[in-house]
Regions:
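Short strand-turn segments of transmembrane beta-barrel domains in outer membranes
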Residues: 94-104, 114, 118-149, 182-185
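Short, acidic, small-residue-rich periplasmic hinge/interaction motif at the N-terminus
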Residues: 1-24, 32, 62
Length: 203
């Protein structure tokens, strides 16, 4: 859809879908920033020193929300508050959000809901995708993905995902309230992922 966010009603569970069009509206987004236009999920800072973010669903903290990577549980325990910032939004095809207690097929941690991430696939038709962002604080961010068939029959394909971002306060330390402490931490982030897919003759 043009809006990027819509409610799925064709499955067993009703849930919100954040499509790639919705993710493109937030060019600087990591996973934590991907929910800015979502009415189902609230994101805030849980630690101002490290910049860790925490999600809230149905008024409860993110520890009660199960986060899935293509229906596989991820971000358990201590990785939950920091993993949101380490997943670039431009690596995702879509995000599915379902509120309330759901199926235990993918795990039992979902009390307030589930968030499922669908990444870009090696079989994507878009062979090259480049995204560059620069905000008013001179924070740059670069995302690149390239999906290629390795063999002529396309049985073997791969995708390379690259991400880099800098938040070094080039215009000076951010201290809008004048308390002597930076409002945001300085960060440098680089991430690389390489996925392969082999399709056998028998499927």
């Amino acid at each position: 859809t043009l809006g990027g966010n819509y409610v799925k009603r064709d499955g067993i569970l009703k849930g919100e879908m954040i499509s790639f069009a919705g993710l493109c509206k937030m060019a600087c987004c990591n996973l934590a920033e991907s929910f800015e236009n979502s009415a189902s999920v609230t994101v805030g800072y849980s630690d101002a020193i490290s910049g860790a973010r925490q999600i809230k669903m149905l008024g409860l903290a993110g520890t009660y929300t199960q986060i899935l990577d293509e229906n596989r549980p991820i971000m358990r325990g201590l990785s939950a508050p920091y993993g949101l910032s380490y997943t670039p939004g431009m690596w995702l095809n879509s995000i599915q959000v379902s509120k309330g207690i759901s199926s235990v097929t993918a795990g039992h941690e979902a009390i307030t809901g589930q968030i499922n991430l669908e990444h870009r696939k090696p079989t994507d038709d878009e062979r090259l995708f480049i995204n560059f962002y620069l905000d008013d604080e001179l924070r740059p961010e670069l995302n690149l993905s390239t999906a290629l068939p390795v063999t002529k029959d396309k049985k073997l394909s791969t995708i390379l995902l690259l991400h880099g971002s800098l938040d070094t306060h080039l215009l000076g330390d951010m201290d809008d309230n004048g308390d002597g402490f930076m409002d945001l931490p300085k960060t440098r982030l680089g991430a690389v992922a390489n996925r392969w897919l082999y399709t056998a003759d028998n499927g």
